[in-house]
């Protein structure tokens, strides 16, 4: 477990640490060698969001989960494992270790909007992995896989730099668990 880095990042373009990956940027960019062996890390990073791409200020106070200060949990692989293992382990953690009811779990998968010039391609790998997991759990993948756009499911570090599709898990916490994936 890697300790939270300072809220005042060593980065000229950031006022505050706004994401769990900030302290790992030099590793992602190949400027530093990964100090973790194997190439894995987990962290709980204190974050402040006060502007920029992931600005949550307009949502603070409008619901129960948007805050401008929070702790972001993260697990990171630096060439040690990839999407298949990450998705399988996330499912295992939620449903077998933490015992969340499987029927309340939904996964998002990146689906670009070509008319908006969204980058990259549909994340077929993540879709196929989630499809198999939900099917094996006796759940309808077409209900439990939700398509996300560039804003929600394409991770970018500024206008240039490391980027790519991401997949997120959401838990339906409504009393009747009847959102059917309407996140």
Model regions and ranges:
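Structured aminoacyl-transfer and RNA-binding surfaces used for tRNA recognition/handling
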Residues: 1-183
């Amino acid at each position: 477990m890697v300790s939270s880095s300072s809220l005042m990042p060593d980065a000229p373009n950031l006022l505050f640490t706004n994401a769990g990956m900030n302290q790992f940027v030099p590793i992602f960019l190949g400027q530093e060698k990964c100090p973790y062996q194997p190439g894995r890390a987990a962290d709980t990073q204190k974050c402040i969001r006060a502007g920029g791409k992931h600005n949550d200020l307009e949502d603070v106070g409008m619901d129960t989960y948007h805050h401008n200060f929070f702790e972001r949990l993260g697990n990171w692989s630096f060439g040690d494992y990839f999407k298949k293992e990450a998705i399988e382990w996330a499912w295992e953690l939620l449903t077998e270790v933490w015992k969340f009811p499987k029927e309340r779990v939904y996964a998002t998968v990146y689906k670009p909007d070509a008319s908006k010039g969204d980058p990259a391609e549909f994340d077929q790998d993540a879709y196929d992995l989630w499809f198999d997991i939900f099917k094996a759990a006796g759940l309808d993948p077409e209900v439990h896989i939700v398509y996300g756009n560039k804003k929600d499911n394409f991770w970018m570090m500024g206008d240039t730099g490391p980027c790519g599709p991401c997949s997120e898990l959401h838990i339906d916490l409504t009393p009747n668990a009847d959102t059917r994936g309407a996140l």
